[in-house]
Every structure is written in C-alpha cells, then in structure tokens.
Amino acid sequence: MAQSVPPGDIQTQPGTKIVFNAPYDDKHTYHIKVINSSARRIGYGIKTINMKRLGVDPPCGVLDPKEAVLLAVSCDAFAFGQEDTNNDRITVEWTNTPDGAAKQFRREWFQGDGMVRRKNLPIEYNP
C-alpha cells in the first residue's frame, strides 16, 4: 500500500524562495516548477499564508514519477511598506497516491493517516 511508504522528494525551481520586485501597484506573476523526483505518483496541494495577496494556479494536482508542473504564483497589488509581508510564503504539500487511484486529485488523500510532506518557499519582496 502506497500510504505506508513515506513520500519521496520533490524539487522546486527556484529551490529556496520566491522573489517579487517593486512596483506593487499591479499584479505580478512568477512561475515555479515542481518536479516529482520520487518513484511513486504523488498528489500535491499548494497553500498560501496570505490568500488575499497571493494565489497559485493550479493549486493542486497529481504528478507521476519524474513528472513536472509549472505553477503560476501571483501577487496582487498592495501598499508595500504598509502591510506586513514578513511571514508570506507558499507551502507545497505532497503525499503518495493510493495504489490504483486515478490520476485525479482528491483532497481526502491529505486527511487520512498517510504521511504528508511539506516544503516552504518564503516570499521576498524587493522595494
């Protein structure tokens, strides 16, 4: 059963953080790549700390071994310097899909007793 095996590694490009550059009076979009470097199919979901400022498309999906997906991370216009951005980040969560499951994302994969891994990508705002 897939759930008894810990999920393998993923890679992200960029690997450690996302950087948005001023001006912030218009929406910015930054692309990141998520690569399933494990030998099993995984389901992934993306969470953001600040949902009114940050969005991710697609927010979830399924990746076969060695498959990659390009995600659009968008930052809506905001008043830079007047809002707290210190804790802004996106979090990639992933788990193995059950054996024989269709290649269609299901939220319940993350709600059972299977292991879920996380990778945080802090967001940096350049003035």
UniProtKB/Swiss-Prot annotation:
It comes from the Eukaryota. Sperm. The keyword Membrane does not apply. Central component in molecular interactions underlying sperm crawling. Forms an extensive filament system that extends from sperm villipoda, along the leading edge of the pseudopod. The gene is msp-49. PROSITE patterns: MSP. Keywords: Acetylation, Cell projection, Cytoplasm, Cytoskeleton. It is found in: Cell projection, Pseudopodium; Cytoplasm, Cytoskeleton. This is Major sperm protein 49. Coiled coil: none annotated. The modification N-acetylalanine is found at A2. Residues 9-126 form the MSP domain. Around 30 MSP isoforms may exist in C.elegans. GO terms for cellular component: cytoplasm; cytoskeleton; pseudopodium.
